[in-house]
Each structure stands twice: as C-alpha cells, then as structure tokens.
Design a protein with these regions (language model features):
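Iron-sulfur (Fe-S) cluster-binding modules
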Residues: 1-109
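Small-residue-enriched alpha-helical segments and adjacent helix-cap loops
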Residues: 2-7, 108-218
Length: 218
C-alpha cells in the first residue's frame, strides 16, 4: 500500500467538521431578543413599563415637585409621555458640551402634543391656546412633524394639562424620544379632489388600538 493511498483512506474516514450556526445579531430589545438589553433605555423598559410613569407624575411628582423625580424617570420615561426638560437659560454655548445633564436642565419641561394626521378641531386648538396662556408663558410651536410644543411647563401642572387635553381628544403620549412621535397624514385628507385614498380611518385605528397597547409601548 502506498503512502498516498493510506493518506486518502484516513481522509475519507475523518468526520466532517460540523458547521457553526450563525448567531443572530441581537436587536437590543429585551422583549424581542429575550437577552440582555444593549442600552440603558431598553434596560429601563425591562424594569418598568414606559407609561407607568404617568401615574407617578399624578400621584407623587406633581405634588412633591421637580426635585422628587428620579433620573431614570426624568429620562427616558418622561420622553415617552411627551416631555423633555428644558435647557437652562443664559448658558455659554461653548461650555454646554462639558456640562452634565443636571447642570444643563432647568426645572421646567417642554411638552409635545400629538396632532396625528395633521388634524385638530377648533375646540382642540382653543384648548391648546388656553393651556399656553395658563401654563406655558404663551408659547406654542408648530413642528414639521405635525405636533405642537409648549414650553415652561411645571410638573405641578402636568395632570391638569393632560386632563384638559383629554377632553378634546388630544394627548402628549409618545411625544418625544425614539418612539412613534406622531402618525403623519395629509391635512387635506377627505377634502382634496385628487385624493386616491383617505388615510384618516387607518390613522385613527392605529392611534386608538396600537399606541396604548403596552406590548407595543414597551
């Protein structure tokens, strides 16, 4: 028997190496992957559903004031109910990159009100105007995402503002952060002569059925 034939026989008997299974890249979402979250926002959602902060705002923070709010509620959970802390006035622009969040933020909020589909009733606009006068120093910014932003909001006033908005079918939920901030639509839906399809029923269904669902909110 030659060396070549022996080598060939050994090679034939050697089992093939099993193929390694390719690991699926984690998405960083604990509810999707069932793995450790990749960032703090996902970790915080794992510990407590995002919208749970609403009740704490009503029961605790609006009564005990800004200083009672823990950091992990202030960001990101407040974002998910439509509020950012405002930046302090008069800060040197060159120094802002070196300051901490606590040094940058003021004890007031910007609240973003959703206008899904770019549609709002006259009663809704009137309510926003009244809230602006009473609680937001007459501020109201219309954004290119079809939302309205109010500034200088005190935590003590937030429950009252939410209640007034709810009376006219408006809210601030999912207004800020990496969330579906608004459902864009045409403000002339149902009116434009060249319209192919009126998207308002779909927008309304998404707003009522999907957005409040905790399975999607978290």
């Amino acid at each position: 028997m030659t060396t070549e034939s022996t080598t060939g026989a050994d090679a034939a008997q050697k089992p093939a190496r099993p193929r390694r299974k390719k690991q699926r890249k984690p998405q960083g979402q604990w509810a999707v992957d069932g793995r450790e979250p990749l960032n703090d926002d996902e970790r915080i959602k794992q510990e407590d559903p995002g919208f749970s902060v609403m009740q704490r705002i009503r029961d605790i923070y609006s009564k005990e004031g800004f200083d009672s709010i823990p950091a992990e509620d202030l960001a990101p959970r407040f974002k998910w109910v439509g509020m950012y802390t405002q930046r302090k006035q008069g800060l040197d622009g060159e120094k802002t990159s070196t300051l901490t969040n606590a040094e940058l933020q003021d004890n007031y909020f910007m609240m973003r009100i959703r206008l899904d589909g770019g549609v709002v009733s006259s009663a809704g606009l009137r309510t926003i105007g009244e809230i602006s006068e009473k609680h937001a120093r007459n501020t109201a910014d219309f954004t290119d995402r079809q939302n309205v932003q109010l500034h200088w909001i005190r935590i003590e006033d937030v429950p009252t503002i939410w209640d007034e908005l709810a009376k006219v079918g408006l809210d601030s939920f999912f207004g800020c952060g990496d969330v579906p901030r608004v459902i864009l639509g045409s403000p002339v839906a149902g009116i434009a002569k060249d319209e192919i399809i009126d998207g308002r029923p779909a927008i309304e269904k998404i707003k009522k059925e999907l957005l409040p669902d905790p399975e999607f909110g978290n």
